[in-house]
């Protein structure tokens, strides 16, 4: 047998590592002089392009006074962000915000935790966290000091930034879920909410029933990228009609909500206007291959930067078998053999944006996550084994070599076959 025509099969070992962490990144090596104020803003996750929910993952803005002088322009403020690839947010949205706030001093602002679960910088969370971090510095100097003061009235801030050029397809709903009292609430996408221009008109759905019945987990892999992919937000259905079905399933929690997420994903991936990326096809096929009759997986939704999975309440912390089931199916569909790690994050409801104080941790859930690492095992083919007589054992009366008698096909035992093919005896 010619082994060169058959590449060795690749098997995998799966290693699961579970951990937990605080929802707010701690300051490490922060020895800068002077008082500092920290503002936090929750990131959000959407479901089926209809519902926006704040989650227990936060962007943090740490602000110090750089100069007591009134800035001549927004360019005087110093903005520090680790992700230099997104310098446009510093030059654009952040500068616009600092200009419109009409600040009385020059500040140094450090941004951390800016990436959401999709892996992208959340422009909304960054701006809201900055606003919250400036409040205690600026509020005593704000001469309006009335009920519409931008430092004490979230609706005034919302009205100022709602027309900014955010990348988000549902920017107003994301703003609402990030700024306002948002715990245990779903915010409507603005396509379903005509009153959203007025923040008092925000309509929400309670998420208490869904969160009591299910674990929602955001999953990504080393193959996912934060690059924006429009096909994941393509929607040819009537969004309002779909939203009516979503509302019904939220009010009466059962597995229909999870099944509706799968159907919505199927419609997204089936788009012919913009072909889905390889990682989208890989995860979609792999998740469908998981036998939901033998798994804790109830439903899933393909998203930008990853996918959501739905489990019965408590399964995430109690077991990890379902993680291995998902990992094994993704590996089976990975033609590139490039899948190395899969990251699982249990979603908990987030708190509203505010100025950070240490006692807030008492009211926050820990973040629970897990990583499945894939270790490749290359299975080598066995070397061919030759059977038969050696030259020393050949009989003295050797038969003539001409006109050999054809071998009877039925007479092919191990003792007289030329080679032993291990693959044929599996």
Curated annotation (Swiss-Prot):
Compositionally biased residues, Basic and acidic residues: 405-415
Coiled coil, from the record: none
Origin: domain of life: Eukaryota
Disordered: annotated segments: 390-426
Family: Belongs to the GHMP kinase family. Xol-1 subfamily.
Name of the protein in question: XO lethal protein 1 homolog
Organism: Caenorhabditis briggsae
Gene of this entry: xol-1
């Amino acid at each position: 047998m010619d082994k060169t025509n058959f590449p060795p099969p690749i098997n995998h070992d799966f290693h699961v590592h579970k951990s937990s962490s605080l929802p707010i990144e701690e300051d490490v090596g922060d020895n800068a002089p002077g008082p500092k104020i920290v503002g936090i803003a929750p990131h959000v996750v959407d479901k089926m392009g209809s519902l926006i929910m704040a989650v227990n993952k936060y962007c943090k803005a740490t602000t110090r006074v750089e100069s007591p002088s009134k800035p001549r322009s927004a360019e005087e403020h110093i903005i520090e962000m680790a992700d230099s690839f997104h310098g446009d947010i510093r030059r654009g949205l952040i500068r616009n915000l600092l200009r419109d706030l009409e600040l009385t001093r020059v500040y140094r602002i450090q941004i951390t935790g800016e990436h959401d679960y999709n892996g992208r910088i959340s422009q909304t969370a960054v701006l809201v966290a900055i606003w919250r971090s400036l409040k205690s510095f600026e509020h005593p100097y704000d001469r309006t000091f009335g009920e519409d003061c931008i430092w004490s009235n979230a609706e005034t801030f919302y009205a100022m930034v709602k027309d900014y050029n955010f990348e988000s397809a549902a920017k107003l709903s994301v703003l609402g879920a990030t700024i306002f009292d948002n715990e245990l609430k779903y915010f409507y996408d603005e396509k379903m909410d005509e009153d959203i221009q007025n923040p008092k008109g925000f309509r929400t759905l309670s998420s208490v029933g869904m969160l009591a019945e299910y674990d929602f987990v955001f999953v990504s892999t080393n193959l996912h990228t934060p690059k924006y992919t429009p096909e994941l937000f393509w929607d040819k259905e009537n969004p309002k009609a779909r939203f009516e079905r979503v509302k019904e399933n939220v009010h009466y929690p059962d597995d229909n909500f999870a099944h509706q997420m799968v159907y919505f994903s199927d419609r997204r991936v089936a788009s012919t206007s913009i072909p889905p990326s390889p990682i989208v096809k890989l995860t979609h096929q792999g998740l469908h291959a998981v036998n939901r009759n033998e798994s804790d997986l109830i439903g899933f939704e393909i998203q930008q930067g990853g996918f959501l999975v739905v489990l019965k309440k408590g399964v995430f912390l109690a077991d990890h078998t379902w993680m291995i089931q998902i990992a094994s199916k993704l590996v089976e569909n990975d033609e590139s053999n490039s899948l190395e790690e899969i990251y699982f994050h249990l979603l908990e409801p987030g708190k509203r944006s505010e100025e950070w104080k240490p006692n807030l941790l008492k009211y926050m859930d820990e973040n629970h996550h897990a990583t499945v690492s894939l270790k490749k095992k290359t299975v080598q083919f066995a070397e061919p084994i030759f059977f038969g007589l050696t030259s020393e054992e050949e009989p003295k009366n050797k038969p003539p070599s001409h006109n050999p008698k054809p071998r009877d096909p039925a007479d092919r035992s191990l003792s007289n076959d030329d080679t032993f093919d291990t693959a044929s005896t599996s």
